[in-house]
Amino acid sequence: NYMTTNDNGKNDYLIIENIERFPENNLEIYNRYGVRVYKTDGYGINGNVFTGYFQAKVTVDKNEKLPTGTYYYILNYTKHDKSGQTQVIKKVGYIHLENH
């Protein structure tokens, strides 16, 4: 996953394919030091996406761009099957963010 914060319409936010099929989700993003820099519920719903800005601590300005680097994410989402069973799925991965 590759992102930029240059607002050119390409790679401007984290795309998680088909996440709209699982609205019961939460996403956390951490920097290389393990500090959470982003947290949200309902990722991908109504424009709720990660655009490379701080959004987890009240001590940091939410309008401040994150520095270039690799970030790690944890995505949890609830999956309901046809029989009515519910399963919570956990996915982890990384994002490379370029801040120009």
What residues fall within each predicted segment?
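Short loop/turn motifs at secondary-structure boundaries
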Residues: N1-H100
